[in-house]
Amino acid sequence: MIDYIKGNLVAVEPAYLVVEANGIGFQIYCANPYRFINDLNREVVVPTHHYVREDSQRLFGFTTRTERLLFEKLLNVSGIGPKGALAILASGEPEDIIHAIEQEDEALLVRFPGVGKKTARQIILDLKGKLDDMAPMLEPAAGADKQQKNPQLEDALEALRALGYVEKELKKVEKQLKAETLETDEYIRRALALMLKRP
């Protein structure tokens, strides 16, 4: 088991990071590699999960150990593989996902990519009551950008502020926007549509 990779972050790609350690470039797949963009060409410490199958091996990386543990628990759910688990992590914060599972909030879970009602029920069935060990593990990994986890959303919110929208209005739609993975212009259009629907 490779617990973590410590080295120089030499590339950030849409699906993975490249971290050079001891002259070797490790390709590390992440839910959102751009969380590390501010640490390009700096030393990072990335918690990892070494996924091994007969025909392939991959390293998956995370911003926190909590995120990694949640990924590993999601892999134990029938019907969820590494791509599905990463898609869920890319679309929500670990604490929000854990809360949805513990509260049996199927409506929130089905918002995640690839999660239908059947899979949402399976996640709740398999994981409810088994996530208590994750609560104390919420500190970010060294090198992870905690403040700007979603640059596209932050840019969209800043643009909306420039248009004259106040924090109270933005807070009402921000949580829903966080559950989606969009480009900046798409976040702006989505936010405007949501605010127009509100009384």
Swiss-Prot record:
Q: Any domain commentary?
A: Has three domains with a flexible linker between the domains II and III and assumes an 'L' shape. Domain III is highly mobile and contacts RuvB.
What does the UniProt entry say about where the protein is found?
A: Cytoplasm
Q: What does this protein do?
A: The RuvA-RuvB-RuvC complex processes Holliday junction (HJ) DNA during genetic recombination and DNA repair, while the RuvA-RuvB complex plays an important role in the rescue of blocked DNA replication forks via replication fork reversal (RFR). RuvA specifically binds to HJ cruciform DNA, conferring on it an open structure. The RuvB hexamer acts as an ATP-dependent pump, pulling dsDNA into and through the RuvAB complex. HJ branch migration allows RuvC to scan DNA until it finds its consensus sequence, where it cleaves and resolves the cruciform DNA.
Q: Where is this region: Domain I?
A: 1-63
Its name, as the record gives it, is Holliday junction branch migration complex subunit RuvA
Subunit structure and binding partners: Homotetramer. Forms an RuvA(8)-RuvB(12)-Holliday junction (HJ) complex. HJ DNA is sandwiched between 2 RuvA tetramers; dsDNA enters through RuvA and exits via RuvB. An RuvB hexamer assembles on each DNA strand where it exits the tetramer. Each RuvB hexamer is contacted by two RuvA subunits (via domain III) on 2 adjacent RuvB subunits; this complex drives branch migration. In the full resolvosome a probable DNA-RuvA(4)-RuvB(12)-RuvC(2) complex forms which resolves the HJ.
Q: Which parts of the sequence are annotated with region: Flexible linker?
A: 143-153
Protein encoded by which gene: ruvA
Cellular component GO terms held in the UniProt record: cytoplasm; Holliday junction helicase complex; Holliday junction resolvase complex
- List, alphabetically, the SMART domains matched: HhH1
